[in-house]
């Protein structure tokens, strides 16, 4: 058996010995009213998915079938979604998605103090699965990544911990945890939101930003988490405390996202989005309606798995010059009825009704929206269940909109049922 085949067999074994932990307890306060009822990982995205589906699908498609989701803030919607949409795995052959709600499992009287504390409080559950490797993932980013390539890099380098990194312009890196590497991509410094991010060797105008994705050797992870838990000065966070404390002591290596990204057809720019603001959320959704979006949801070789509701096909009715049900340059999901209204450059989630003579332009409408007759919407996000009154105009007068709704710096208007009730 040649060396390449032996190495591949070792990776296949390693995938089965890997436990993925998805940190899904974040509130996502910068999304404002979109997270009033549910955590950020449970927020709908892309017409039919929830954000949590992306890291879970990456695990599934990469061959990692042992997944645990750590929840905390307003977890009911997230738990309900995973129970309905991710129950197809076969527990009898070691496949599962387990839900780990915050339970104060240690002697601390607080909930999770940070990302590292969330993992530390579940060490007993992790040890029960006896993993060789632990893959730690953020549950609130949109991207497609082959974790088997990340794991192969970790094993080949003999790392204690591997940090997945995406290169970004240096001027944009100040909002991220940044890593400084040597010529072999060994991490020599880890800096949380630095004012002057270090450049990449050979590319001084770019910086490595941590993606919040880590692979640890399990025994190494147990040791450093137990030590960190005793440190009263620590914030118990992987980016702020755990990784910086081990740089120079353990073998901490950077993994370039470009080496494991699942690319869209015809594109060589890695796609990774933190949709943590209203503007970023709108932009990432609206990008999907373009002819060749940066994120390919139509890739049958790397499907995004989710709960599939039983809904009828979308329907478009009425066809006269003044009353035509139509959509162009848009995504329209199952259960929608465009009844004599016009939809342009927009994304409609399931069960949205667009009534006659209305206009929807550059707008994201979450499930069960109803757009009244003669209403006009431009550059909006409508939260779940919004019912737009007949004749209401949003997105054309920013001063008036700001008095009634939240308007972002980029001019996106966030509309919610609670704000509509005050009109």
From Swiss-Prot:
It comes from the Bacteria. Gene3D superfamilies: Hexapeptide repeat proteins, Spore Coat Polysaccharide Biosynthesis Protein SpsA, Chain A. It catalyses: alpha-D-glucose 1-phosphate + ATP + H(+) = ADP-alpha-D-glucose + diphosphate. Pathway: Glycan biosynthesis; glycogen biosynthesis. InterPro entries: ADP-Glc_PPase, ADP_Glu_pyroP_CS, GlgC_bac, GlmU/GlgC-like_hexapep, NTP_transferase_dom, Nucleotide-diphossugar_trans, Trimer_LpxA-like_sf. Keywords: ATP-binding, Carbohydrate metabolism, Glycogen biosynthesis, Glycogen metabolism, Nucleotide-binding, Nucleotidyltransferase, Transferase. Alpha-D-glucose 1-phosphate binds at residues 112, 177, 192-193, 210. Disulfide bonds: none annotated. One of its GO terms (biological process) is glycogen biosynthetic process. The keyword Nucleus does not apply. Involved in the biosynthesis of ADP-glucose, a building block required for the elongation reactions to produce glycogen. Catalyzes the reaction between ATP and alpha-D-glucose 1-phosphate (G1P) to produce pyrophosphate and ADP-Glc. HAMAP family: GlgC. Belongs to the bacterial/plant glucose-1-phosphate adenylyltransferase family. PANTHER family: GLUCOSE-1-PHOSPHATE ADENYLYLTRANSFERASE, GLUCOSE-1-PHOSPHATE ADENYLYLTRANSFERASE-RELATED. This is Glucose-1-phosphate adenylyltransferase. It comes from Rhodospirillum rubrum (strain ATCC 11170 / ATH 1.1.1 / DSM 467 / LMG 4362 / NCIMB 8255 / S1).
